[in-house]
């Protein structure tokens, strides 16, 4: 599924997009508040995530953005992207 809005992806769009980009493999019914780290978001996946997010949403993610709080769930990640694109 393509993210339709570069400015504020929904958590559901983000789940599909993360799968499509090969960042992390999530089940089709992965919850919006599901734990991404428990689902397999490891350090290598974070590197892929940063590159994909920066490219797709035309933002820069700094070290301060790469916290457990920001990367915990599709909802928190969508919120981070929304703030960065505002």
Language-model regions: role of each:
Residues 45:
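Two-component histidine kinase catalytic core, primarily the HATPase_c
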Residues 20-38, 58-65:
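Phosphopantetheine carrier-protein modules
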Residues 2-27, 79-86:
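Thiotemplate assembly-line natural product biosynthesis machinery
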């Amino acid at each position: 599924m393509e993210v339709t809005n570069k400015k504020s992806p929904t958590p559901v769009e983000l789940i599909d997009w993360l799968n499509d980009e090969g960042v992390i493999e999530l089940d089709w019914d992965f919850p919006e508040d599901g734990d991404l780290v428990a689902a397999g978001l490891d350090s290598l996946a974070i590197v892929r995530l940063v590159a994909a997010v920066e490219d797709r949403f035309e933002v820069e993610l700094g070290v301060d953005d790469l916290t457990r709080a920001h990367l915990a769930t599709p909802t928190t990640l969508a919120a981070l992207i929304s703030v960065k694109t505002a």
